[in-house]
Amino acid sequence: MKRPDYRTLQALDAVIRERGFERAAQKLCITQSAVSQRIKQLENLFGQPLLVRTIPPRPTEQGQKLLALLHQVELLEEEWLGNETNSDIPLLLSLAVNADSLATWLLPALQPVLVDSPIRLNLQVEDETRTQERLRRGEVVGAVSIQSQPLPSCLVDKLGALDYLFVASPTFAARYFPNGVTRSALLRAPAVAFDHLDDMHQAFLQQNFDLSPGSVPCHIVNSSEAFVQLARQGTTCCMIPHLQIEKELANNELVDLTPGLFQRRMLYWHRFAPESRMMRKVTDALLAHGHQVLRQS
């Protein structure tokens, strides 16, 4: 059986985390040549490339499996040895989360864990359709995703759903939709998307108004909080989680443009199995709060 030296695995992990050999060397306090040598040793052991040497580097399929193994071992080591050998070093937990969860329910869910446990969070923000891929690549140990099926050697639990409403300010609604939300009016109304892969707004308009993707003018803004600000100041209409704008809807700063029509995104919590003690705490906290504030039906 091929058993890797975990120093070489840590070099591979550092290159991926730091997005390059030079910064990985600085992180590990060794030379760049030493990083390259360790990864070469690992590749010789397994007889195949473990890195695609692009900018930034990315792991091959076998590299992803090894990184996942490393992260599982680190968590299990913490469970068995952490209190005795590394009590002064907070455990690093890398999680992939979507921006809307981060802006709404996720941080309150993690609050009791952050207060009671010595951990450092590395929250990697990604669209909920792509967070599971970061878990597959071994970049994180847990992910909030819309995928309901677990990866091999992983666990999954349902968290609940975010319901997205199509909203705008009253002044925006009066300007662009004086006769209600119609197909022709939507073609003139500025909207906003998180990035070029964010298809929620387009999917909503296609499903309910038969508008083809790309037919509506759309800003690109990588911030959930900015969506709310843009809508409040009357510059765009957009899809925002109901949970994020309850106050604005109640005081009429924002209005639901299409009552009864919404987009529902069911969210699931994925993580490696077996769970360490610390990851079990994270899981319990996320499920407890998620089941409380997210839609369960």
Curated annotation (Swiss-Prot):
Protein name per its UniProtKB record: HTH-type transcriptional regulator ArgP
Any one GO MF annotation of this record: DNA binding
The gene coding this protein: argP
CDD domains, per the entry: PBP2_IciA_ArgP
Keyword Transcription regulation: yes
Pfam families xref list: HTH_1, LysR_substrate
Signal peptide limits: none
Organism expressing this protein natively: Pectobacterium carotovorum subsp. carotovorum (strain PC1)
Record-annotated HTH lysR-type domain positions: 4-60
Keywords of this entry: DNA-binding, Transcription, Transcription regulation
Disulphide bonds in the chain: none
